[in-house]
Amino acid sequence: MTPDDRPSLDLDGSLDPFGTNAGTHSALPGGHESAEGGVEYSTGTTTVGIVAADGVVLATDRRASLGGQFVSNKSVVKVEQVHPTAAVTIAGTVGAAQAYLKQLRAEADLYENRRGSRMSMEALSTVGSAILRGLPVSPLLGGVDPTGADENGAGEPHLYQLDGAGGRIEESAYAATGSGMTVATGALEREYDPDADVEVAVPTAVDAVLAASERDTASGNGVVVARVTGDGVETELRDATGAHMGGAAGGVR
């Protein structure tokens, strides 16, 4: 069976917390059945990542949609912590995203229990890309090497683009994915400061997502932003103007 023949993990709606299964394929942000009866997956959303001097900033919009045509949820949290010093942004099908996050967390725990040491970002990204193969999920993985990792460089920030073919690319500055990535990349190109710390990089990430939301119909309804440092992952919500709304809990679990 090829990845294209693989049935959705969410066909019965049991992994659809947004209640959007209504004859079409529920997705973060969208997917639909093709004329041939197969499932086509889109990556309509906006996710961005920025490498800062002391960590990584991840940000996404909050909209879930069906094929970018119908807004099915306006308060989705698309950034998830997967390790004490790492988080993932998610674009793709809800069921597959949930399964991917659970497996990645389990693999990280198993790795550390077997080796008796903390998992480096290099190792986490390798595992993350391997288990993603064939899944309709498009993540950014950002994190900081923890103290006690196998490799040297504790405190070093890393940002990776992962793809469904098992690919893995480390970004040295910033990255954007999803249907709003063109506008977001332009905003990042204009505002990115290579010497900025996490606090300075947060507004840049938020501005990039908001800029994309102005033009991309599959993105919008505010921003989820995560600060990832050696001290952990701190997630917060911003409204459609970028104003702070408090901490974020839950998401694509």
Predicted region positions:
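A two-mode feature
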Residues: T2-D5, G164-R253
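Contiguous domain-boundary segments centered on the initiation and propagation of an alpha-helix
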Residues: T2-T43, H83, T89-A165, A240-G242, ...
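Solvent-exposed alpha-helices and their adjacent loops that cap or buttress functional pockets
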Residues: G38-T43, V48-V51, V71-S72, V79-V82, ...
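Short beta-strand scaffold segments in enzyme catalytic cores
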Residues: T46-I50, V56-L58, V137-D145, G222-R227, ...
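Short, well-ordered beta-strand elements
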Residues: I50, V56-D61, P84-G92, E171-Y174
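Beta-strand scaffold of nucleotide-dependent catalytic cores
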Residues: V57-D61, F70, Y160-D163
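A phosphate-binding glycine/aspartate-rich beta-alpha loop in the early core of alpha/beta enzymes
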Residues: R62, G67-V94
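A short, polar/proline- and glycine-enriched secondary-structure boundary/capping micro-motif
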Residues: G67-N73, Q98-K102, E170-A173, M245-G250
